[in-house]
Amino acid sequence: MSTLTPREIVSELDRFVVGQEKAKRMVAVAMRNRWRRQRLEPSLRDEVAPKNIIMMGPTGVGKTEIARRLARLCGAPFIKVEATKYTEVGYVGRDVESMVRDLMEIGVSLIRDEEATRVRARAEAAAEERLLDLLLPQSPADGGETRQSTRDKLRGLWRQGHLDDREVDMEVEESTKGPQMDIFAMPGMESMGNQFRDLMGKAFPARRKMRKMKLREAWNLLVDEEASRLLDQDKVVDIARERVEQTGIIFIDELDKVASGEGTHRTTDISREGVQRDLLPIVEGSVVNTKYGMVRTDHILFIAAGAFHFSKPSDLIPELQGRFPLRVELDPLGRDEFYRILTEPHNALTRQYAALLATEGVTVSFTDDGLREIAAFAEEVNEETENIGARRLYTMMERILADISFDAPDRPGEHVTVDAAYVRTHLEDVRVDKDLSRYIL
C-alpha cells in the first residue's frame, strides 16, 4: 500500500489535474486513512469503514481524472462504471454485482503483471534457452562440444541484435476468431456465464499449431509463456482478492441520473429508486461471488460523481446518502484554468501534439498569446453552446492543427509557430458562424 502523505498525494495529482484543491485534499485523506487503518489492531481495523465520496460538478472538470490518477498512484485496482447502465435485476441492463466482478478481473490482471515483472529475469533466461533450441534443433550427429560452441555463438549474435529478423517455425496456441456468443445474457446471470465458459475452456483446451515468425516476436511469446509457468496462479488470485478488498476503488459516474429530481415522472422515479436500492448492499458491504471466489466489498472505496444540475444528493434514498458521507463540489473551468491546463500538467495537450508531430520531423511551438487565445475561444464556445469543460480543448486543438497534421509527412524539417494570429485564422470562421460552432467545436 502507498505510504504517501496527503500532501505528497496532492502534489502528485497537481502534475496532471489543474485546480480542484478541495477534491484533491479529500481523496488524499481518504487514501491516507486506508494506510492508517492497516496499522490498527485487527479487532479495531475491521470496524473502520471507508468514507465514500460524492463529487459534484459539470462534465470535463476533472472528476474522473482525479480518481483514475489516484488509483494509479497508489497501485489500487480501479474501475469506472456508469450508474445508468445498471437497472433493477429482472429488467434490461446489468446486475450491479458485475462491477465487483469486473474489479476483481482488473485486480488479478494487475497482480499478474506485477508478479510477471518480478520473475521476468528468470523467464528471460528460460526463454533464451528455448530460443536457441529453435535456432539449433537437437541432432544425434552433433557432438557435445561442437554443439555447445555453436550455441554460444548464436547466443552472442542474438544478444547483439543480429538475429532479430531471422524467421523460425514455432508452435503457438491457435487463436479463436469470430464472434463470441454470450452463454447467458439475462441480468444477474453474468457470473454463471463466465463459469460456464471457463468450464468449457478446461474441457476443450486451445489447439496449438506451427507458425512462422521473426525471432523477436518468438522471443516475446516465449518470455510470456515462461513467466506464466513461473507464476503461482493461486497466489496471484489470493493477493488480488486482498488488494481488491482492502484498496479497490469503484468510481460510479452519473449518479445524479438515478436520483429523483424535480420534474421526473413517477414511473422513472420508481426505476431510479430501484437502481439505488440495488447499489445499496454493494456500497454498504456485502459478499459477491466471482469466478475467483467470494469478494467482500466492506472496505472498497466508492467515489460517486455527477453534475447534479436537475437533482441534488439529498434526492437519493436516505440509506444511500448515509453511505456517502463526504461531499465535494468541483469548480467550473474558465479561461484561466484552460490556460493552465495547456501549460502546467506533465501530460499537457500542447506537449502531446508537439511530440506526435515531431515523429514526422515537424516542430510545433506554442506562444503564450496563442495559448491564451485558445483558452479564450474555449471559454466562449462553452458559454454559448454546451459546457463540456476541458474536453473543449481537444476539439480546439484538433481544429487548429488539422492542416499541419494532414500535411506533416510532406513537410519534414518545417517549424510551425502557433500564435494568436494562427489561432484566430483557424477558428474565426467558427466564431462568426454560431451554428457551425455547435457542430465543429
Curated annotation (Swiss-Prot):
<feature type="binding site">
    <location>
        <position position="319"/>
    </location>
    <ligand>
        <name>ATP</name>
    </ligand>
</feature>
<feature type="binding site">
    <location>
        <position position="18"/>
    </location>
    <ligand>
        <name>ATP</name>
    </ligand>
</feature>
<dbReference type="InterPro" id="IPR027417">
    <property type="entry name" value="P-loop_NTPase"/>
</dbReference>
<dbReference type="Pfam" id="PF07724">
    <property type="entry name" value="AAA_2"/>
</dbReference>
<dbReference type="GO" id="GO:0051603">
    <property type="term" value="P:proteolysis involved in protein catabolic process"/>
</dbReference>
<dbReference type="GO" id="GO:0036402">
    <property type="term" value="F:proteasome-activating activity"/>
</dbReference>
<dbReference type="GO" id="GO:0016887">
    <property type="term" value="F:ATP hydrolysis activity"/>
</dbReference>
<dbReference type="InterPro" id="IPR004491">
    <property type="entry name" value="HslU"/>
</dbReference>
<dbReference type="GO" id="GO:0005524">
    <property type="term" value="F:ATP binding"/>
</dbReference>
<feature type="binding site">
    <location>
        <position position="253"/>
    </location>
    <ligand>
        <name>ATP</name>
    </ligand>
</feature>
<keyword id="KW-0547">Nucleotide-binding</keyword>
<dbReference type="InterPro" id="IPR050052">
    <property type="entry name" value="ATP-dep_Clp_protease_ClpX"/>
</dbReference>
<feature type="binding site">
    <location>
        <position position="391"/>
    </location>
    <ligand>
        <name>ATP</name>
    </ligand>
</feature>
<dbReference type="GO" id="GO:0043335">
    <property type="term" value="P:protein unfolding"/>
</dbReference>
<keyword id="KW-0963">Cytoplasm</keyword>
<dbReference type="GO" id="GO:0008233">
    <property type="term" value="F:peptidase activity"/>
</dbReference>
<comment type="similarity">
    <text>Belongs to the ClpX chaperone family. HslU subfamily.</text>
</comment>
<feature type="binding site">
    <location>
        <begin position="60"/>
        <end position="65"/>
    </location>
    <ligand>
        <name>ATP</name>
    </ligand>
</feature>
<dbReference type="GO" id="GO:0009376">
    <property type="term" value="C:HslUV protease complex"/>
</dbReference>
<protein>
    <recommendedName>
        <fullName>ATP-dependent protease ATPase subunit HslU</fullName>
    </recommendedName>
</protein>
<comment type="function">
    <text>ATPase subunit of a proteasome-like degradation complex; this subunit has chaperone activity. The binding of ATP and its subsequent hydrolysis by HslU are essential for unfolding of protein substrates subsequently hydrolyzed by HslV. HslU recognizes the N-terminal part of its protein substrates and unfolds these before they are guided to HslV for hydrolysis.</text>
</comment>
<keyword id="KW-0067">ATP-binding</keyword>
<dbReference type="Pfam" id="PF00004">
    <property type="entry name" value="AAA"/>
</dbReference>
<dbReference type="InterPro" id="IPR003593">
    <property type="entry name" value="AAA+_ATPase"/>
</dbReference>
<dbReference type="InterPro" id="IPR019489">
    <property type="entry name" value="Clp_ATPase_C"/>
</dbReference>
<keyword id="KW-0143">Chaperone</keyword>
<comment type="subunit">
    <text>A double ring-shaped homohexamer of HslV is capped on each side by a ring-shaped HslU homohexamer. The assembly of the HslU/HslV complex is dependent on binding of ATP.</text>
</comment>
<dbReference type="InterPro" id="IPR003959">
    <property type="entry name" value="ATPase_AAA_core"/>
</dbReference>
